[in-house]
């Protein structure tokens, strides 16, 4: 991009780059932009996002190429994958509820007390546009501050469906205990 004369670039990062130790309490995750260091993401994906942010910021410092970085928090919406194990939690939950027989059971990984926030894709696109048009350089969270436990989310989907279903918590990957977007910086 630099060699081609690009003046501004956008990088889509992820909340997965935040340190695992800041996300152990499901009721009080610490995901402000300033809490990223000391670095300790819980996965290789998180490390890749963190290293890529550093790379883009170095281009800003060394080559004056403007960079805008959004740390996405659980974006969902139409046209999102909803089958095959690669779907986001909202789509997976909706699929499980839709496929369950009325009076049946859906399985939720872990104890269901882990928390997340979810942002609809249209709101995400608006945030990207505003960020790219701004003068702000540096990573910024793009997500909702409305946190919900996975069990409560499952109950909400069940209620909307009109079905009577039981939630069965099972062993399975759960990720960090809590993740929620701290939007103080983006509000400035």
Where are these regions (language model features)?
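Conserved Rossmann-fold NAD(P)-dependent oxidoreductase catalytic core, especially the SDR/UDP-sugar
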Residues: 1-44, 68
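Active-site Tyr-X1-5-Lys
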Residues: 3, 20, 40-73, 92-102
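Conserved cofactor-binding/catalytic machinery of classical short-chain dehydrogenase/reductase
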Residues: 8, 51-52, 120-123
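Structural signature of the Rossmann-like NAD(P)-dependent dehydrogenase/reductase core
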Residues: 9-11, 68-74, 108, 117, ...
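Conserved sequence/active-site signature of Rossmann-fold short-chain dehydrogenase/reductase
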Residues: 17-18, 68, 75-77, 124
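Short beta-loop-alpha junction of Rossmann-like oxidoreductase domains
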Residues: 21-22, 78-81
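Short-chain dehydrogenase/reductase
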Residues: 31, 37, 41-53, 83-91, ...
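C-terminal substrate-binding subdomain of Rossmann-fold SDR/epimerase-dehydratase oxidoreductases
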Residues: 99-188
């Amino acid at each position: 991009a630099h060699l081609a004369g690009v003046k501004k670039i956008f990088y889509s990062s992820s909340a997965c780059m935040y340190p695992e130790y800041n996300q152990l309490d499901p009721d009080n995750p610490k995901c402000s932009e300033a809490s990223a260091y000391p670095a300790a993401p819980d996965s290789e994906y998180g490390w890749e996002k963190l290293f890529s942010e550093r790379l883009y910021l170095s281009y800003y410092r060394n080559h004056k190429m403007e960079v805008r970085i959004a740390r996405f928090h659980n974006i969902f919406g139409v046209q999102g994958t909803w089958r095959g194990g690669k779907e986001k939690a909202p789509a997976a939950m909706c699929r499980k509820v839709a496929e369950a027989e009325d009076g049946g059971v859906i399985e939720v990984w872990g104890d269901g007390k882990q928390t997340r926030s979810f942002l609809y894709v249209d709101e995400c696109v608006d945030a990207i546009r505003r960020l790219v048009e701004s003068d702000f350089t540096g990573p910024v969270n793009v997500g909702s501050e409305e946190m919900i436990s996975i069990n409560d989310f499952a109950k909400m989907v069940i209620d909307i469906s009109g079905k009577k279903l039981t939630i069965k918590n099972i062993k399975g990957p759960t990720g960090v205990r809590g993740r929620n977007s701290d939007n103080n910086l983006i509000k400035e």
